[in-house]
């Protein structure tokens, strides 16, 4: 489902612990880390899509989380030119997203990255609230900064001083010319996850 402007409706998920740290996951067979996200089906509301993506990508169910809030309207980002498939009947140039802030209320042992036959992630860890803005792939940094800036007051209502004001380094991380790189896997990751048995090739970006 792509709108007339070329953007695919999508939901993003910021899953937070009580202390303000957020869920950060590595994509299968790629060196990029990101928040859970995924496209909406034509018959879904944003909330329905969020719960579906949450279960597909993390194994968590509605009873394991509390919805603290969401961004109003759509937040957009464009895909880099190399990722745009110009030969498609409907050309997707980017994503328009509603971002949800969830608090983990269940035990983190409920996280199952291999809940589906085609997992999105293979490892995950907890990171500081603003960390993702500086470490996600460059073309997503702007939308991450806008989403987290909006959700931060809601997060502070739970975590208090565990969620600080956006640091200068994060505010500048998505500006042109910034040199910070995105996360890359360690040879022995200090993370939770599993190792896929066999590579099947990279699919389209979600």
UniProtKB/Swiss-Prot annotation:
Residues of the region (Disordered) are 175-206
UniProt keyword annotations, A-Z: Hydrolase
Which cofactors, if any, are listed as required?
a divalent metal cation
In this chain the Nudix hydrolase domain maps to 6-149
Taking the record's annotation, the residue ranges forming a coiled coil are: none
Q: Which organism is it from?
A: Stenotrophomonas maltophilia (strain K279a)
Q: Which PROSITE patterns does the entry mention? A: NUDIX (PS51462), NUDIX_BOX (PS00893)
Location of motif Nudix box in this chain is 38-59
Q: What is this protein called?
A: RNA pyrophosphohydrolase
- Indicate yes or no for the key word Signal: no
Output the Pfam families linked to this UniProt entry.
NUDIX
What family does this chain come from, according to its entry?
Belongs to the Nudix hydrolase family. RppH subfamily.
- What InterPro entries would the database entry show? NUDIX_hydrolase-like_dom_sf, NUDIX_hydrolase_CS, NUDIX_hydrolase_dom, RppH
Question: In the UniProt record, does the keyword Hydrolase occur?
Answer: yes
User: What function does this protein fulfil?
Assistant: Accelerates the degradation of transcripts by removing pyrophosphate from the 5'-end of triphosphorylated RNA, leading to a more labile monophosphorylated state that can stimulate subsequent ribonuclease cleavage.
Q: Known NCBIfam families for this protein? A: PRK00714.1-4, PRK00714.1-5
UniProt-listed Enzyme Commission number(s): 3.6.1.-
**GO MF term list:** pyrophosphatase activity
